[in-house]
Amino acid sequence: MQTFKKSLVFTAMAAASSAALAAESEKPNIVVIVGDDVGFADTQPYGSEANTPNLMALAEEGVKFTNFHASPTSSVTRSMMLTGANSHEVGLGTFDYAVYPGAIGKPGYEGYLTKKGVTVATLLKESGYNTYLSGKWHLGHDDGFLPDDRGFEESYGILAGGSNHFNRDMMFPAKNAATADALQKGDIPGVEVEPTYRNGEVVEDKYKGEYSDQVYTNEIIKMIDSKKDDGKPFFAYVPFTGIHLPLQAPESAYQDKVDYYVEHGWDSVREDRFQRMKEMGVIPKDADISDRNALSRPWDSLSEKEQKWYGKKMAVAMGMMEMQDQQVGQIVDYLKEIGEYDNTYIMYLADNGPEAADITGENISDLIRTWTAHHFDNSTENLGKANSSVSLGPEWASASTGGLSWYKAYTAEGGIRVLFIVKPAKALLAAEDALQPGTQTDDLSQVKDIAATILEIAEVDHPGTEYQGREVAPMSGVSLLPYFKGETADVHSANNAIPFELFGSGILLKGDYKIIRISTGMGGDSEWHLYNTKKDPAEQHDLRNEMPDLFLEMVAEYQEYEKAQNIVPVDEAWNPFENVK
């Protein structure tokens, strides 16, 4: 009789376990892919001349957002995307490569993802998901703050903001005693290797000579494949390092593009992209292109030799873009091969606008410029190779945005309006009132919405303000699922204010409107301006005098945010580019 009772217990346990496993396996998989420093108009779905058919296919099968906002810099965006919280609440009120001196040591300005941020990976792992990361982390270098500490059961890649795409050498001088000693002696620091980490441990880079995005694609596929038969859903995070500096790619990726960019130049490419975006409905047909800013020169002011050098830079960058698209296609093909594509949400976004800092030019620190010139061969013939190191620079960055205002590091639209494509699971789009495949929307949305969306997809609750006995930052994004299902007309209500600040430059988004203040040190006038960014995405028509009540209301809301977040005032003359280390 006792044996019979035990067998009933074991049978019941087995049945419960099987039911739980079945419930897990029915949950959708989630893949988030991040293109690094990809400009708003750098891909085919958003008006680029570059050939990105795999991103085009995702847009045709899913939803393309044309009014989606990230932060102006890499790690800051990633902190909000993975936690759904305000960046100042989780340690990323600053950018680790350019910290304002007055903010050093202040809460919220740690420069890494603090324990006040609970990542979606942590919560999904606890709920039964397999969680994987392959690529760059850029949210912490110390024990306790690495990917394996923040919810990723398997991870591979670098901790820094970028590295050499062929050999993982550091892109800037190391922040260590050797560099400090060299500088004290008046010497130029050497080039060190960016450590490669697997599951929190430094490992040998077995892929030297292989291209970064290809390496990270192969690794994420290996991770998924290793547990594809365990019945559990997976969350795969693929933060690529392309098309971040240094601009490097196999010659076959860009050799057929050089003549095009030399012949057309940045002014023509910028205008052509702006026009294509109008034709595609990415921006309004009556929108005005942004004025040339003070950092940009006319293409025809360059000598023929200079045009060949600058033209090749953009050719390499767009070769990198097309290679990344191929890696997206490889991931899609793999998911189809294992029968998981239809049950997988795929999200592709950029972390910020294109890189305007020119590491061989004037708008960068003396240390970076001198170090780059000393160690790398940046002749026209050598651009794109492993022993070259260049960045896009302000003029090509302006073309990369398609004519929006400013670029990376700026809170203007060129710095924060980024491409965002979501290919939902098949079951969602099959719902009666759901958005149709190929939908393009100019509804306002933001990077914090991704975390909220991921948790709702996985049917996981956020803990709120307390997790495992410690205070944590609440989510302030909203889930996109009700919008996808046709249950709501807008992602955010017209009254929902979305404030943000970095480097002393603030914004507040609200419905169709945006206030923005850019410091004089970054080329602005340190005054607040008001724009309707749905109609005027290049921020050319200031409405503060036409709509004074709304303007003052939004400024007051931003000031409340500034006070609540204990935002450190930044000297008006300070410039992050000149302080990059």
Where are the language model's segments positioned?
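Gram-negative bacterial Sec-dependent N-terminal signal peptides
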Residues: 1-22
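Histidine-centered active-site microenvironments of extracellular/periplasmic hydrolases
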Residues: 143-151, 248-249, 333-423, 430-435
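Short, solvent-exposed loop/turn and secondary-structure capping segments
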Residues: 41-47, 70, 77-80, 90-95, ...
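Long, internal low-complexity/basic segments
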Residues: 24-28, 35, 39-40, 64, ...
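Formylglycine-dependent
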Residues: 93-126, 138-255, 264, 294-319, ...
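Active-site-proximal N-terminal segment of extracellular/periplasmic enzymes that hydrolyze or transfer
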Residues: 24-63, 126, 137, 259-261, ...
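C-terminal cap/loop subdomain of S1 sulfatases and analogous C-terminal strand-loop tails that border
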Residues: 154, 158-166, 172-179, 386-415, ...
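Short, structured active-site-proximal loop/turn typified by the sulfatase FGly-forming signature C/S-X-P-X-R
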Residues: 48-80, 84-88, 128-132, 150-159, ...
